[in-house]
A protein has these predicted regions:
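Hydrophobic ligand-binding cavity/cleft-lining segments
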Residues: 2-96, 102
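N-terminal intrinsically disordered, cationic/polar leader segments
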Residues: 2-5, 71, 132, 146, ...
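Extended beta-sheet lipid-handling architectures
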Residues: 39, 66, 83, 96, ...
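Short, ordered beta-strand-loop transition motifs
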Residues: 73-79, 104-108, 143, 156-161
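Short connector loops at helix/strand junctions that flank enzyme active sites
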Residues: 76-78, 94-98, 106-110, 128-134
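Beta-strand/loop substructures that line and gate deep hydrophobic ligand-binding cavities in soluble
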Residues: 125-194
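A conserved amphipathic terminal alpha-helix motif
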Residues: 184-231
Length: 232
Protein backbone atom coordinates (compact mmCIF):
# COMPACT_ATOMS: atom_id res chain seq x y z
CA UNK A 1 0.00 0.00 0.00
CA UNK A 2 1.32 3.45 -0.94
CA UNK A 3 1.26 5.54 2.23
CA UNK A 4 2.69 8.68 0.58
CA UNK A 5 -0.16 11.23 0.45
CA UNK A 6 -0.72 13.70 -2.31
CA UNK A 7 -0.03 17.37 -1.69
CA UNK A 8 -3.28 19.17 -2.57
CA UNK A 9 -1.32 22.28 -3.61
CA UNK A 10 0.61 20.50 -6.37
CA UNK A 11 -1.41 17.36 -7.13
CA UNK A 12 1.76 15.28 -6.83
CA UNK A 13 3.12 13.06 -4.11
CA UNK A 14 4.66 15.15 -1.32
CA UNK A 15 8.20 13.81 -1.09
CA UNK A 16 9.90 16.87 0.32
CA UNK A 17 13.05 15.93 2.22
CA UNK A 18 14.14 17.67 5.41
CA UNK A 19 15.60 21.13 4.71
CA UNK A 20 19.26 20.11 4.73
CA UNK A 21 18.74 16.47 3.79
CA UNK A 22 19.74 15.22 7.24
CA UNK A 23 17.61 16.98 9.85
CA UNK A 24 14.74 14.82 11.07
CA UNK A 25 11.21 16.02 11.68
CA UNK A 26 11.82 16.33 15.42
CA UNK A 27 14.41 19.05 14.84
CA UNK A 28 12.85 20.57 11.73
CA UNK A 29 11.97 24.28 11.64
CA UNK A 30 9.44 23.66 8.84
CA UNK A 31 6.17 25.30 9.90
CA UNK A 32 4.21 22.40 8.39
CA UNK A 33 5.65 19.92 10.89
CA UNK A 34 3.25 19.23 13.75
CA UNK A 35 3.84 17.34 16.98
CA UNK A 36 0.91 15.37 18.41
CA UNK A 37 1.40 13.59 21.73
CA UNK A 38 -0.70 11.51 24.11
CA UNK A 39 -0.29 9.25 27.16
CA UNK A 40 -2.28 6.35 28.55
CA UNK A 41 -2.17 4.22 31.71
CA UNK A 42 -3.93 0.94 32.39
CA UNK A 43 -3.84 -1.99 34.78
CA UNK A 44 -3.90 -5.76 34.22
CA UNK A 45 -4.61 -8.26 36.98
CA UNK A 46 -2.76 -11.57 36.54
CA UNK A 47 -3.77 -14.46 38.79
CA UNK A 48 -0.25 -15.74 39.35
CA UNK A 49 2.90 -14.72 41.25
CA UNK A 50 5.13 -12.06 39.72
CA UNK A 51 7.81 -14.65 38.88
CA UNK A 52 5.33 -16.58 36.71
CA UNK A 53 4.11 -13.41 34.99
CA UNK A 54 7.71 -12.31 34.45
CA UNK A 55 8.63 -15.63 32.84
CA UNK A 56 5.70 -15.18 30.45
CA UNK A 57 6.67 -11.61 29.54
CA UNK A 58 10.30 -12.67 29.02
CA UNK A 59 9.12 -14.89 26.13
CA UNK A 60 7.86 -11.94 24.10
CA UNK A 61 8.41 -13.72 20.79
CA UNK A 62 5.15 -15.54 21.52
CA UNK A 63 2.77 -13.13 23.21
CA UNK A 64 3.75 -9.86 21.50
CA UNK A 65 2.89 -10.95 17.98
CA UNK A 66 -0.30 -12.68 19.10
CA UNK A 67 -1.51 -9.79 21.22
CA UNK A 68 -0.55 -6.92 18.91
CA UNK A 69 -2.92 -8.18 16.18
CA UNK A 70 -4.63 -6.79 14.16
CA UNK A 71 -1.70 -4.36 14.00
CA UNK A 72 0.90 -5.68 11.55
CA UNK A 73 4.01 -7.02 13.32
CA UNK A 74 7.34 -8.14 11.85
CA UNK A 75 10.41 -9.34 13.81
CA UNK A 76 13.38 -6.98 14.10
CA UNK A 77 16.49 -8.61 15.57
CA UNK A 78 16.39 -10.67 18.77
CA UNK A 79 14.25 -8.32 20.86
CA UNK A 80 12.60 -6.02 18.36
CA UNK A 81 9.56 -5.72 16.14
CA UNK A 82 8.33 -3.45 13.38
CA UNK A 83 4.80 -2.39 14.29
CA UNK A 84 2.28 -0.66 12.02
CA UNK A 85 0.07 1.45 14.28
CA UNK A 86 -2.87 2.12 11.99
CA UNK A 87 -4.10 5.17 10.11
CA UNK A 88 -3.50 8.62 11.51
CA UNK A 89 -4.49 11.83 9.80
CA UNK A 90 -6.25 15.15 9.74
CA UNK A 91 -8.65 16.77 7.28
CA UNK A 92 -8.25 14.09 4.62
CA UNK A 93 -4.46 13.78 5.01
CA UNK A 94 -3.53 10.30 6.27
CA UNK A 95 -0.43 8.26 7.01
CA UNK A 96 -0.09 4.76 8.43
CA UNK A 97 2.86 5.10 10.84
CA UNK A 98 5.28 2.20 11.19
CA UNK A 99 7.70 2.15 14.12
CA UNK A 100 10.57 -0.06 15.23
CA UNK A 101 10.26 -1.24 18.84
CA UNK A 102 12.71 -2.96 21.17
CA UNK A 103 11.46 -4.90 24.21
CA UNK A 104 14.17 -4.42 26.81
CA UNK A 105 14.96 -7.12 29.41
CA UNK A 106 13.31 -6.76 32.80
CA UNK A 107 15.00 -4.50 35.34
CA UNK A 108 13.69 -4.70 38.91
CA UNK A 109 10.24 -5.79 37.82
CA UNK A 110 9.91 -3.22 35.03
CA UNK A 111 9.78 -4.01 31.31
CA UNK A 112 10.33 -1.15 28.87
CA UNK A 113 9.50 -0.82 25.19
CA UNK A 114 11.39 1.86 23.28
CA UNK A 115 11.64 3.15 19.74
CA UNK A 116 14.50 1.93 17.53
CA UNK A 117 15.34 2.72 13.88
CA UNK A 118 13.76 0.57 11.18
CA UNK A 119 16.43 -0.73 8.78
CA UNK A 120 16.00 0.27 5.14
CA UNK A 121 13.14 2.62 6.02
CA UNK A 122 11.57 4.51 3.12
CA UNK A 123 13.25 7.94 3.03
CA UNK A 124 10.13 9.50 1.48
CA UNK A 125 8.00 8.33 4.39
CA UNK A 126 10.64 9.44 6.90
CA UNK A 127 10.21 12.94 5.50
CA UNK A 128 6.47 12.76 6.24
CA UNK A 129 6.31 11.40 9.78
CA UNK A 130 8.30 10.27 12.81
CA UNK A 131 7.11 8.27 15.82
CA UNK A 132 8.37 8.03 19.40
CA UNK A 133 6.80 5.08 21.25
CA UNK A 134 7.75 4.59 24.90
CA UNK A 135 5.95 2.09 27.10
CA UNK A 136 6.52 0.28 30.37
CA UNK A 137 5.02 -2.66 32.23
CA UNK A 138 5.63 -2.77 35.99
CA UNK A 139 4.96 -5.90 38.02
CA UNK A 140 3.52 -5.45 41.52
CA UNK A 141 2.76 -8.66 43.40
CA UNK A 142 -0.14 -8.60 45.86
CA UNK A 143 -0.41 -11.46 48.36
CA UNK A 144 -3.21 -12.65 50.59
CA UNK A 145 -1.49 -11.51 53.77
CA UNK A 146 -0.89 -13.10 57.19
CA UNK A 147 -4.57 -13.80 57.93
CA UNK A 148 -5.15 -16.03 54.92
CA UNK A 149 -6.04 -18.97 57.17
CA UNK A 150 -9.04 -17.07 58.55
CA UNK A 151 -10.78 -16.36 55.23
CA UNK A 152 -13.71 -18.32 53.82
CA UNK A 153 -13.46 -20.71 50.88
CA UNK A 154 -15.28 -18.18 48.68
CA UNK A 155 -12.56 -15.61 49.31
CA UNK A 156 -9.60 -17.84 48.50
CA UNK A 157 -9.74 -17.19 44.75
CA UNK A 158 -10.15 -13.45 45.24
CA UNK A 159 -7.23 -13.21 47.65
CA UNK A 160 -4.85 -15.70 46.05
CA UNK A 161 -1.38 -14.43 45.16
CA UNK A 162 -1.71 -12.31 42.06
CA UNK A 163 0.23 -9.68 40.17
CA UNK A 164 -0.83 -6.26 39.00
CA UNK A 165 0.80 -5.24 35.73
CA UNK A 166 0.80 -1.47 35.36
CA UNK A 167 0.97 -0.38 31.73
CA UNK A 168 1.97 3.13 30.65
CA UNK A 169 2.34 4.39 27.09
CA UNK A 170 3.64 7.73 25.83
CA UNK A 171 3.26 8.21 22.09
CA UNK A 172 4.42 11.20 20.04
CA UNK A 173 3.95 11.62 16.30
CA UNK A 174 5.59 14.29 14.17
CA UNK A 175 3.84 14.87 10.82
CA UNK A 176 4.69 17.16 7.94
CA UNK A 177 1.27 18.39 6.85
CA UNK A 178 0.37 19.49 3.32
CA UNK A 179 0.50 23.27 2.87
CA UNK A 180 -3.26 23.41 2.30
CA UNK A 181 -3.98 22.24 5.86
CA UNK A 182 -1.72 24.86 7.41
CA UNK A 183 -4.06 27.65 6.23
CA UNK A 184 -6.69 26.38 8.68
CA UNK A 185 -6.84 27.90 12.19
CA UNK A 186 -3.85 26.70 14.19
CA UNK A 187 -5.83 25.62 17.30
CA UNK A 188 -8.21 23.58 15.14
CA UNK A 189 -5.39 21.68 13.42
CA UNK A 190 -3.65 20.98 16.73
CA UNK A 191 -6.64 20.00 18.87
CA UNK A 192 -8.20 17.77 16.22
CA UNK A 193 -4.89 15.94 15.75
CA UNK A 194 -4.36 15.57 19.50
CA UNK A 195 -7.88 14.18 19.87
CA UNK A 196 -7.34 11.62 17.12
CA UNK A 197 -4.02 10.51 18.58
CA UNK A 198 -5.62 10.07 22.01
CA UNK A 199 -8.14 7.74 20.43
CA UNK A 200 -5.39 5.75 18.72
CA UNK A 201 -3.29 5.48 21.91
CA UNK A 202 -6.33 4.44 23.90
CA UNK A 203 -7.32 1.83 21.33
CA UNK A 204 -3.80 0.39 21.07
CA UNK A 205 -3.40 0.23 24.85
CA UNK A 206 -6.82 -1.22 25.62
CA UNK A 207 -6.61 -3.92 22.96
CA UNK A 208 -3.03 -4.83 23.86
CA UNK A 209 -3.63 -5.03 27.62
CA UNK A 210 -6.84 -7.01 27.23
CA UNK A 211 -5.20 -9.48 24.86
CA UNK A 212 -2.10 -9.91 27.02
CA UNK A 213 -4.27 -10.57 30.07
CA UNK A 214 -6.42 -13.10 28.21
CA UNK A 215 -3.43 -14.75 26.52
CA UNK A 216 -1.55 -15.15 29.81
CA UNK A 217 -4.43 -16.81 31.62
CA UNK A 218 -5.36 -19.03 28.66
CA UNK A 219 -1.75 -20.21 28.26
CA UNK A 220 -1.58 -21.09 31.97
CA UNK A 221 -5.05 -22.64 32.25
CA UNK A 222 -6.20 -20.00 34.77
CA UNK A 223 -9.60 -18.26 34.72
CA UNK A 224 -9.21 -14.71 33.48
CA UNK A 225 -10.42 -11.98 35.87
CA UNK A 226 -12.92 -9.39 34.63
CA UNK A 227 -11.57 -6.39 32.79
CA UNK A 228 -10.88 -3.27 34.78
CA UNK A 229 -11.81 0.22 33.70
CA UNK A 230 -8.96 2.07 32.03
CA UNK A 231 -7.01 4.72 33.93
CA UNK A 232 -6.60 7.76 31.68
Amino acid sequence: MDMTPTDPTTGSADRQAPPDGTIGLRESSDGRVRLYASSFADLMEMRAPAAVVGAYLDRHEGWFRRCAAPMAVEPLGANGYVLTLGRFGNFGFEVEPTVGLELLPQQEGIYRIQTVPVPDADAALAALYDVDFNASLRLDQADAGPDRGLISAEEVDRLMAHTLVRWELDLSVWIRLPAMITILPDPLVQTSGDHLLRQIVRQISRKLTWKVQEDFHASHGIPCPPRRRARF
